Structures are given as structure tokens and as C-alpha cells.
């Protein structure tokens, strides 16, 4: 554990260019250059990378994989308190009233205007498409649409929490469908039903036919507790959850299509939440530069996986 911690600490201090590997290579054999024994790489780092990248086969380009692992080494893991909707709600709350419109169907867009189904045409000085890859390509024909990786997330409730605390539990042996799991109620109690523990688990790739039974059997082995009394609260399968980053992949794809037209999202960076946020910052900086707006943020921002 000490060697692993030291290796991750060194990685966290590594600047981006040396940390990034050749774009044409994959990370199928796991991260290299950390000086760790094979059992640590196979039992911990490979499952961790698979979790960070939603890529159980680790066909992701080495550069993208190294960037994702470095973000983890720098900031660890985090989730927004109150659920994934909390972050955009906080961003919207900082803007003037009536700035944000939701539930609007955009039918066409260009540098000077946005056409909507409900509100007609809206004028603009510049346009930023902050959407998934498919929606961006529909509005901007010519943008490349990548392949996608499917992900299934299951939420179980239990009378008592398994004794793992706030830890992320990885399947180092790849002995079942679950790639990683955590007792989410220990991390963020607001997500759990009152009086119950909430366990959130992720299946990468095609899920098994008998999903709940297979997952609960695997969770019993991972947590070392009986799961017969656990209740499946919800299961969400997304066949296009994460853009694939198979080699060669450029994790710093341009966000400026041309002056006045910008696009951001996990498909322009690493296919992670951190990558989506980073591409958004790159796009915002490009817009401020092109509009000659002073006062752009120049300090470092928190990073995590």
C-alpha cells in the first residue's frame, strides 16, 4: 500500500506532457512506468483504470488513460452532494434570473442564432454546444461521432450498510458482472431512503440477462455479507454512456470550431466527468479570448476523478 501511495503521489506531481503516453498505444496491459509489482498493477490499478474509463478491456489510448489516472492521483474520487443534478443547479443559481431556459428543443444553430421549437429564433454573439457527441453532430454536421461504451448502474437498499465505509470496492479478480461498487449512503446520506443504506454498483459492457440476481450474488462476495434481503431500487442502462477513447485518441480535441462557434463535452477531452468539465473550461476561455473579455480565471481549479 505504501508503494502504491508513493507511486500515485509521484504521478500527481508529474506535468501533463511527460504523463501523457503515445496516442497510438492502448493501456491493455495496465499503467506502466510506476515501478509497481505485477500483482498490484493487475489487482488494483487495472480495475481502477477500468472503473475510471468505463473500459474493462483497457483499449483506451495510453495518453487518455494516463491523464485520467493522474487526475485521480491528484484529487481522488468525489461525487456532488445531493446527486448529479446539484452541479448544474449550483452553476445556474450563480447567474442572473431568467438567464437559463430548460426544456427547450433546439432544431438548428449557427454563430449568430439558435432556432428552437418552442421559442422561435434567438440571436447570439457566439454559440457553445455543451452536449453529448450525438446531439452535437446533429446540430453541427461534420463533427465526428465516436463509438460508445455501455454502462449499467444499479441502486440497492439494505437494512444495514456493509462494513466498508466510504471506500470504492473494486473487483480485482473480475469474478462477476460488477466492476465497482460503494455504499453511497456512507458518502452522501442525502441520497438514501430514510432508515436504509444505499449501495450503488456499476456494470461495464453488456449486462447479464438475470441482472439483479447476478449482481446481488457478486455483491455478496465483494462485501462479505448476505444480500438476499437487499431491494433493487433502480437500474439504469445506457448503451451510449461513455465515448470510447481507443487509440489513437486525442484527449485535447479542439473546442473552437471557428471564431464564434464552440463545442465541449467528454467527447472533446477524456471521457470522464473531469474531462467534460475541463473541456468546458477550455471552451469558456476560448470564448472570453475571442470576445476580448478581460478577467478570465487563471488559477488552478480542483481536480478529481
Predicted regions and their residues:
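Helical element adjacent to the flavin cofactor pocket in flavoenzyme catalytic cores
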Residues: 64-126
Amino acid at each position: 500500500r505504501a508503494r502504491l501511495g508513493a507511486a500515485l503521489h509521484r504521478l500527481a506531481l508529474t506535468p501533463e506532457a511527460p504523463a501523457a503516453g503515445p496516442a497510438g498505444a492502448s493501456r491493455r496491459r495496465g499503467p506502466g512506468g510506476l515501478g509497481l509489482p505485477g500483482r498490484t498493477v493487475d489487482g488494483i490499478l487495472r480495475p481502477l483504470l477500468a472503473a475510471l474509463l468505463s473500459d474493462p478491456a483497457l483499449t483506451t489510448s495510453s495518453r487518455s488513460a494516463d491523464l485520467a489516472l493522474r487526475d485521480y492521483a491528484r484529487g481522488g474520487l468525489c461525487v456532488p452532494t445531493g446527486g448529479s443534478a446539484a452541479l448544474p443547479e449550483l452553476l445556474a443559481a450563480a447567474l442572473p434570473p431568467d438567464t437559463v431556459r430548460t426544456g427547450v428543443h433546439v432544431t438548428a444553430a449557427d454563430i449568430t442564432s439558435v432556432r428552437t421549437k418552442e421559442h422561435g429564433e434567438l440571436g447570439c454573439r457566439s454559440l457553445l454546444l455543451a452536449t453529448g457527441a450525438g446531439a452535437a453532430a446533429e446540430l453541427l454536421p461534420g463533427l465526428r461521432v465516436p463509438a460508445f461504451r455501455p454502462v449499467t448502474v444499479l441502486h440497492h437498499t439494505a437494512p444495514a450498510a456493509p462494513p466498508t465505509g466510504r471506500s470504492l470496492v473494486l473487483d480485482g479478480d473480475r469474478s462477476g458482472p460488477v466492476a465497482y461498487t460503494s455504499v453511497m449512503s456512507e458518502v452522501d446520506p442525502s441520497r438514501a431512503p430514510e432508515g436504509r443504506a444505499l449501495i450503488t454498483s456499476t456494470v461495464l459492457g453488456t449486462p447479464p440477462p438475470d441482472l439483479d440476481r447476478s449482481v446481488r450474488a457478486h455483491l455478496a462476495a465483494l462485501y462479505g455479507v448476505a444480500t438476499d434481503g437487499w431491494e433493487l431500487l433502480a437500474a439504469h442502462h445506457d448503451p451510449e454512456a461513455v465515448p470510447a477513447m481507443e487509440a489513437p485518441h486525442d484527449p485535447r480535441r479542439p473546442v473552437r470550431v471557428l471564431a464564434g462557434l464552440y463545442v465541449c463535452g467528454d467527447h472533446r477531452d477524456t471521457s470522464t466527468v473531469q474531462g467534460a468539465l475541463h473541456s468546458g473550461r477550455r471552451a469558456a476561455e476560448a470564448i472570453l479570448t475571442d470576445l476580448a473579455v478581460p478577467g478570465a480565471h487563471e488559477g488552478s481549479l480542483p481536480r478529481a476523478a
